[in-house]
From Swiss-Prot:
Homodimer. HAMAP family: Acetate_kinase. Pathway: Metabolic intermediate biosynthesis; acetyl-CoA biosynthesis; acetyl-CoA from acetate: step 1/2. Belongs to the acetokinase family. Mg(2+). Can also accept Mn(2+). One of its GO terms (cellular component) is cytoplasm. The gene is ackA. The lineage of its organism: Bacteria, Bacillati, Bacillota, Bacilli, Bacillales. Its EC number is 2.7.2.1. GO terms for biological process: acetate metabolic process; acetyl-CoA biosynthetic process. It is found in: Cytoplasm. It comes from Staphylococcus aureus (strain N315). InterPro entries: Ac/propionate_kinase, Aliphatic_acid_kin_short-chain, Aliphatic_acid_kinase_CS, ATPase_NBD. Mg(2+) binds at N9, E385. GO terms for molecular function: acetate kinase activity; ATP binding; magnesium ion binding. This is Acetate kinase.
Amino acid sequence: MSKLILAINAGSSSLKFQLIRMPEEELVTKGLIERIGLKDSIFTIEVNGEKVKTVQDIKDHVEAVDIMLDAFKAHNIINDINDIDGTGHRVVHGGEKFPESVAITDEVEKEIEELSELAPLHNPANLMGIRAFRKLLPNIPHVAIFDTAFHQTMPEKAYLYSLPYHYYKDYGIRKYGFHGTSHKFVSQRAAEMLDKPIEDLRIISCHIGNGASIAAIDGGKSIDTSMGFTPLAGVTMGTRSGNIDPALIPFIMEKTGKTAEQVLEILNKESGLLGLSGTSSDLRDLSEEAESGKARSQMALDVFASKIHKYIGSYAARMHGVDVIVFTAGIGENSVEIRAKVLEGLEFMGVYWDPKKNENLLRGKEGFINYPHSPVKVVVIPTDEESMIARDVMTFGGLK
């Protein structure tokens, strides 16, 4: 029998939702509530393919959920709130405590709160959503799905930093990795598309959006990933620097008189493509600027692609080879140019890709861009974190 599952991504002043019919993975409706707690909150819901938008004051997440459930009934999406069978909540940080998704109890809620020091901007906001749904829908399973969980299979040699070991033991300082739900979804989908058991595949997953991370997935398990203790580490991103020499932080402080917090703000919000180009963090803008001869925009694109290129080589070495390279997320799914730059020169490791196929895969299309004879397959897969969340609600919420 079909179940209706809500996949939720709660921010401090927003609530993104998708209602999914399982196990068919059929999208029933989706929407977004913005400016929660502020004047003129915006509620957008998709009804029969059309977006319906209303503006009203919404004081908190409980009221937001209430309004969402009322809208479901008003638009005949459900007859009654009891039609909803479970909810799944994206939680950014599960630390070492949560190596997989988990049914939410009071104890789990408390542990997510304790992990807030590892994700102070995200976990408290994710909790607001969890508490609102548990209050208004107390009789159904609620499941937490952690961005970090998929990477908990990394070995010590991948997740430890070369710092005094007691920093790891005392403060939990280690690599955690993020985008786990996306990496898990696309790796499973790649195996399906190849009609091969995931246990037999070495996959390099490139989740490239405004935030970007690369993962080495061996036999379905993450063995390394580019993001670290925080999502600031790894490759160049839209506004994030990615890896830098840590000694640069005190050096910049000394030269500019800025505090550590201010420098961190620069690394998170004023660096990456935006910092390098000086104009935009949006790859589409930079591509246009580069075409019209702006050298710095071209340079930003070159740096961006070269960092990803380097991780692919590194992770192929870690897994003693690679069978599949996956591109996903906004840029990975849509930028013909970045995919081409990243794949350039990888023939030495068995990557032979077809420029024509590459040009044809845009806007949510899925498919292979390698030549048939290529030992390494290259595939573009639109990520679907919400379906992955719904699957985990079925599994961990006891609904199967």
